[in-house]
From Swiss-Prot:
PANTHER family: THIAZOLE SYNTHASE (PTHR34266:SF2). Transmembrane segments: none annotated. This is Thiazole synthase. It comes from Aliivibrio fischeri (strain ATCC 700601 / ES114) (Vibrio fischeri). One of its GO terms (biological process) is thiamine diphosphate biosynthetic process. The active site is at 98 (schiff-base intermediate with dxp). Belongs to the ThiG family.
Length: 256
C-alpha cells in the first residue's frame, strides 16, 4: 500500500509504532520490532543509558534502523518532563519526544494539566511533541492548538490489554483532529489494533501485547497485519451498521 503517514518532519510507511519494555531480552526485542515493520519505537529515558552506545535497549533499535522516540515516563510534573526531554535531545540527537506525565504509579493516568503545560513549553523549545493523554476531545484539541505534532489518546489504561474502551471519545477526537491521532495504551490484541484503525486512527502504539506474548516475534507479525487490514478497511469504506436485517439478495418480483 502506498499509504504514507507524515508526522512532523518524518514520513512513515508503517502505522504500527512500538514500545520496548517487557521483552524477555534484547535479541527478541530487536527481532520483534523488525518483524513488526515498525519505523518508530519508544523507550523510557529512565531505562536507557543514553551515553552508552552499547545500551541493550538503544543499540538494537539503532542497529535495526528504527527511528527513536524517547519518552518521559516517570516524570511526575511538567518541570521533570521538560528536564528529561532536554537531556534526551542532547544525548540522543533527536527532538522527537513522547510526552508522558503520570504522577500516580498505580494507575499511570496521564496528568492533563501538567501535560498541556509541558507540551506548550517543549514546542517553543523546538521539540516534536507527541503527548500521551486521556481520550479527552477538549484536551486533544488544546494540545493540537499549542503545536503538538500528533496526539496519543489512550484506548485503555497502560498495560491493561482491555482494548478500545474509550471508543466514543476516540471517534470524536479523530473527527476533530487536524493532526495525526495515534491510539496508545490498552491495545491487547491484534483485533483491538484493527478496530482503532477502522475508526480512522492514523496509527497505534503497541508494547505489552507484543512483548508479553508467548512468541513476541510472531505476535509482531499479527499486529502488523491487523494494522494494515484495519487501515485498508477504513480507507475503502466499511458497510453501515443497521438496526434491522437488510437482505443481501432481495426477493424482488420473485415468482411473479
Amino acid at each position: 500500500m502506498n499509504d504514507l503517514l507524515t508526522i512532523g518532519d518524518k514520513t512513515f510507511r508503517s502505522r504500527l509504532f512500538t514500545g520496548t519494555g517487557k521483552f524477555p531480552n534484547a535479541s527478541v526485542m530487536q527481532k520483534a520490532l523488525i518483524e513488526s515493520g515498525s519505523e518508530l519505537s519508544t523507550m523510557a529515558l529512565k531505562r536507557v543509558e543514553v551515553n552508552n552506545p552499547e545500551d541493550n535497549i538503544l543499540k538494537p533499535i539503532v542497529d535495526a534502523g528504527i527511528n527513536l522516540l524517547p519518552n518521559t515516563s516517570g516524570a511526575k510534573n511538567a518541570r521533570e518532563a521538560i528536564f528529561a526531554a532536554q537531556l534526551a535531545r542532547e544525548a540522543l540527537g533527536t527532538n522527537w519526544l513522547k510526552l508522558e506525565i503520570h504522577p500516580d504509579p498505580k494507575y499511570l493516568m496521564p496528568d492533563p494539566i501538567e501535560t498541556l503545560t509541558a507540551a506548550e513549553e517543549l514546542v517553543k523549545q523546538g521539540f516534536i511533541v507527541l503527548p500521551y493523554c486521556h481520550a479527552d476531545p477538549v484536551l486533544c484539541k488544546r494540545l493540537e492548538e499549542v503545536g503538538c505534532a500528533a496526539v496519543m489518546p489512550l484506548g485503555a489504561p497502560i498495560g491493561s490489554n482491555k482494548g478500545i474502551v474509550s471508543r466514543d471519545f476516540l471517534e470524536i477526537i479523530i473527527d476533530q483532529a487536524r493532526v495525526p491521532v495515534v491510539v496508545d495504551a490498552g491495545i491487547g490484541a491484534p483485533s483491538h489494533a484493527a478496530l482503532a484503525m477502522e475508526l480512522g486512527a492514523d496509527a497505534v502504539l503497541v508494547n505489552t501485547a507484543i512483548a508479553a506474548a508467548r512468541n513476541p516475534i510472531a505476535m509482531a507479525t499479527a499486529f502488523k497485519l491487523a494494522v494494515q487490514s484495519g487501515r485498508l478497511a477504513y480507507e475503502n469504506g466499511l458497510a453501515s451498521v443497521n438496526t434491522q436485517a437488510v437482505a443481501s439478495s432481495p426477493l424482488t418480483a420473485f415468482l411473479d
